[in-house]
């Protein structure tokens, strides 16, 4: 049960790392992202596809670039992460020692 959550968090972390690279270095291509992150090309490509489906990046002839929606998403991200952390904290089962 927890394994699936961990895998989702790892994948989200990768997607956000790819997004951060696009924001900082746009336009940027798959090969450069793969070389800098150590992620295989197919994983970078998948993250780019997910980010494109969310309208956070778009392809260009020079590589991935941000969209108008990217800034709004980034501004809301920290708040959403904090909400998730609070929810996870409330799920802990305390045991007596």
Task: Give the label of every model feature segment.
Residues 25-29:
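Short capping segments at the starts of secondary-structure elements
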Residues 62-80:
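Basic, amphipathic "hinge/linker" alpha-helix immediately C-terminal to the N-terminal HTH DNA-binding motif
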Residues 32-35:
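A short acidic, leucine-rich amphipathic alpha-helix
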Residues 75-97:
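Amphipathic alpha-helical dimerization/coiled-coil segments
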Residues 38-52:
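Short amphipathic alpha-helical interaction segments
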Residues 1-18:
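Short alpha-helical segments that sit at the start of domains
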Residues 20-24:
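Short, locally clustered residues in the helix-turn-helix/winged-helix DNA-binding domain
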Residues 52-62:
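A short, conserved structural fragment
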């Amino acid at each position: 049960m927890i394994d699936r959550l961990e895998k989702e968090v790892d994948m989200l972390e990768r997607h956000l790392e790819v997004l951060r690279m696009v924001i900082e270095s746009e336009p940027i291509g798959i090969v450069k992202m793969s070389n800098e992150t150590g992620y295989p090309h197919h994983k970078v490509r998948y993250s780019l596809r997910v980010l494109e489906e969310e309208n956070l990046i778009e392809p260009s002839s020079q590589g991935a670039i941000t969209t108008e929606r990217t800034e709004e998403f980034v501004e809301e991200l920290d708040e959403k992460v904090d909400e998730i952390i609070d929810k996870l904290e409330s799920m802990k089962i305390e045991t007596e020692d």
